[in-house]
Every structure is written in C-alpha cells, then in structure tokens.
C-alpha cells in the first residue's frame, strides 16, 4: 500500500505539519485516531468543507480512526480565522439544529459502520458546555500567554479592525477540544485548513503543558483551495455551492465542476477524487493534448457529484446537461426541467388557456414585439422543447407540454423561457 503521507503529498494536500518524521512513524506503527472540526455556521456544509472531510476519509481508508467534531459549542462563539470582521452570533437553538444537519451530512462521507475502524461523530458542546467560567480560566486559560496568542495569525490579523474577547478566546476552546479528545479518545492528530495552523499548534502546546512528558500529538494542515483566475473557490454568481441538494441542486453542483478551468482541473482531481496517481496523470496528459474534449472535467464532475449526491442524482445531472447541450429538451422529465431551468424566467398559465406562439414570445420578452416575434419564427430562431417551429400562426397545444407541466421556449442559442401550467 502506498504510504499515506506520500499519497497526501502527491495530491498536494499537505500545507504544514508538525514533526513529519514522528507522524510518519506513528502512522506506520499503529492505526491512530485523528479529528477535524466543523462549526455549524450555516444549515449545511459547502464545498469548502470537502477537503478536510475527504482527508478524514483517506485516513479511514488507510485503516485509521477518524473523528468528525461538530462545533456545537465553538459554533456559538465564532472562529476569527480568515475573517475581517466579527461574526454575527447565532442562538443556541439554531446552532443545535444546524449541528444535527451537519452531523447527518458527514455520515455520507465517513463509514460509521466499519467493522475495524468505524468513524465517530463528537460534539464539543458535550464537554465545553459543562465547564464553568472558574474551571475554564484556572484549568485551561492559565496555560495561554497573551503575547503567545497575539502572535498567532488568526488574532494578529484582526488587531487593527478589532476583535472581541469572545472570538479572541476561540483559540483556547479549540485547543481544549484537542486536549479533551487526546485524553478521552487517545486522539493524536488534528487536521484542518491552513488558516487553522495557529489554533492547531496552540492545541499541541496545551497538550504538552497539561500531560505527562513524552505525550505525542501532531498537527497537519491542508491548503485552502484556490482558482487560477483569482476568484474565490466555491462561489458562483448564485452564491455558495452547498452540499445540501435543496440549497444547490445536483445539476448545479455537477455544472460547477464541469466548468473547472483547465489550469485547475488536475489539481482538483488530486484534491477531490480517489482516482489513482496513474489515472490522474493520464487525465493530465489528455488535458495537455486535447483540452477541447474536457475529459478531465467530465470525470471530475462525475466523481464528486456521485460522491456527494449518489449515482442516481449524477445520472439526472448528466441527462439535463446533455439535453441542454443537444437541444433535445422533450426527452427530459418534468422533474429534470424543474431542476435544469430553475433560474430561467417563467410564467404560470391556466392549462385550459389557448396560447399563440407569437403572444407568448412577446409576453415572455423573448421578442420585443409581435412583428419581431413573427420574424423570429420565420427566420427559424424559435424552438419549442428544443424543436424549431417556423409556423407563424402556431398555437401551443398539449403535445408541447412535458408531462402536462412545462413548455420550454428558446429564442436563438441561449435565451430560454419556461411556461408552467396550473
């Protein structure tokens, strides 16, 4: 079996680590427990969380014991890492509800039923929530010097703009998580994004001060995902790309990966898939020699969409994509149309109402006037469910409805409009 750290290194998944030689020795000598934390700052995880989740999975596939820590307590405080301003605090009820949703999402990626090394979900509210202020200050806070904390990037980057004591203390709480998991579950490794390096090393320092001499614990950070064009990864014009299919449909999710820049696609295959080194190198060569085929992008989109949403959702996403590309809309189901044309302008009409094509083109603003609508039809620029219609006096009929629910109109190559029937 390929050495785990060598594989992570090939994939570019190691930003920094403490005591590489010691960690490598530990991983080869025993199957260790490791963790990564996920604060419930929304009701769903997004693709920015995929890298640490999939890194936990890589460790599990190598026989180690992953712990996914939901920040039921730290989510009430707010992590200042990477933030220019103070977070808005959410209520305990909301954080609790979001914690449960995130717990459910994590179960898609980690095997909690594995016979030898089942993954574990923990919630730091279970131990932080029980602490009183006196115990916290005496047992934990006394181990942290102010100068030590101010030197950490997560804090120093906020000194100018201001940071509350609440967020200032986040580092201490995360450090206590590591100490608690070290004591309670013999957890020896914390992994996180590169912006977590200061918090992770603070946790190692707390373990060193609190435990007997010779206590072994390690930290490893993974890179923050970047894009070659300089825009923020995981964001589109429509907002964040979520792992919850109700917030980002599998089709939109699939399209996000399909549209990956040639300059990024090989890196993302390494980051987000479990393809072998040989397979990835083959796709790198295909991207170099025949980028127009976009084979690497297709494989990336298939692998990640299947992983997050399952094979059935992937097949639906592919069907919608192919239908839109070929123009063969009538082959889609009503559900496919609903998903694929979610953001297209639409109007609802009575199912008994007769609609002339010219009137619909004007009402939908696909054509600015009846005269222009007639010209568009005559010139072959108007399509009903992907099929060209050249009859000026055409009236939409039941045959033009997909499952009696939708008619998709198109003018030119890209201007779509959706008619829905009630």
Curated annotation (Swiss-Prot):
Keywords: Aminoacyl-tRNA synthetase, ATP-binding, Cytoplasm, Ligase, Nucleotide-binding, Protein biosynthesis, RNA-binding
Paired cysteines (S-S): none
Protein residues bound to ATP: 235
Group of enzyme by EC: ligase
Family, similarity comment: Belongs to the class-I aminoacyl-tRNA synthetase family. TyrS type 1 subfamily.
Quaternary context: Homodimer.
PANTHER family found in the cross-reference section: TYROSINE--TRNA LIGASE, MITOCHONDRIAL, TYROSYL-TRNA SYNTHETASE
Protein purpose: Catalyzes the attachment of tyrosine to tRNA(Tyr) in a two-step reaction: tyrosine is first activated by ATP to form Tyr-AMP and then transferred to the acceptor end of tRNA(Tyr).
Protein name: Tyrosine--tRNA ligase 1
Lineage of origin: Bacteria, Bacillati, Bacillota, Bacilli, Bacillales
Gene (UniProt): tyrS1
């Amino acid at each position: 079996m390929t050495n785990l750290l060598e594989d992570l290194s090939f994939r570019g998944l190691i930003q920094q680590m403490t005591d590489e030689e010691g960690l490598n020795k530990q991983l080869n000598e025993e199957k260790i427990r490791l963790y990564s934390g996920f604060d419930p700052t929304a009701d769903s995880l997004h693709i920015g969380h995929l890298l640490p989740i999939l890194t936990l999975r890589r460790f599990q596939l190598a026989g180690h014991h992953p712990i996914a820590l939901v920040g039921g307590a730290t989510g009430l405080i707010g992590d200042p890492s990477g933030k220019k301003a103070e977070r808005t605090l959410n209520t305990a009820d909301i954080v609790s509800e979001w914690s449960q949703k995130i717990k459910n999402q994590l179960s898609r990626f980690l095997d909690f039923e594995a016979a030898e090394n089942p993954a574990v979900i923990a919630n730091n509210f279970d131990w932080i929530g029980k602490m009183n202020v006196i115990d916290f200050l005496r047992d934990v806070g006394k181990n942290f010097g102010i100068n030590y904390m101010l030197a950490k990037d997560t804090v120093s980057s906020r000194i100018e703009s201001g940071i509350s004591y609440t967020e200032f203390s986040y580092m201490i709480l995360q450090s206590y998580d590591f100490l608690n998991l070290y004591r309670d579950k013999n957890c020896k490794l914390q992994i996180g994004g590169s912006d977590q390096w200061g918090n992770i090393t603070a946790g190692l320092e707390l373990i060193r001060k609190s435990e007997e001499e010779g206590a072994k614990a390690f930290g490893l950070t993974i890179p923050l995902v970047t894009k070659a064009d300089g825009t923020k990864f995981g964001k589109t014009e429509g907002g964040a790309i979520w792992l919850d299919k109700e917030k980002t449909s599998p089709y939109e999710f699939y399209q996000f990966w399909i549209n990956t820049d040639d300059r990024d696609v090989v890196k993302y295959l390494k980051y987000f898939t479990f393809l072998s080194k040989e397979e990835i190198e083959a796709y790198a060569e295909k991207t170099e020699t025949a980028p127009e085929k976009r084979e690497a992008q297709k494989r990336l989109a298939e692998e990640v969409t299947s992983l997050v949403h399952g094979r059935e959702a992937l097949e639906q996403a592919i069907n919608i994509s192919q239908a839109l590309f070929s123009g063969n809309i009538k082959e889609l189901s009503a559900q496919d149309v609903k998903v694929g044309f979610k953001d297209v302008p639409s109007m609802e009409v009575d199912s008994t109402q007769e609609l002339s094509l010219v009137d619909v083109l004007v009402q939908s603003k696909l054509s600015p006037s009846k005269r222009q609508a007639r010209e568009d039809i005559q010139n072959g620029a108007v399509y009903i469910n992907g099929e060209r219609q050249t009859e000026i006096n055409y009236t939409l009929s039941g045959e033009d409805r997909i499952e009696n629910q939708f008619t998709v109109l198109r003018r030119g190559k890209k201007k779509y409009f959706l008619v829905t029937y009630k």
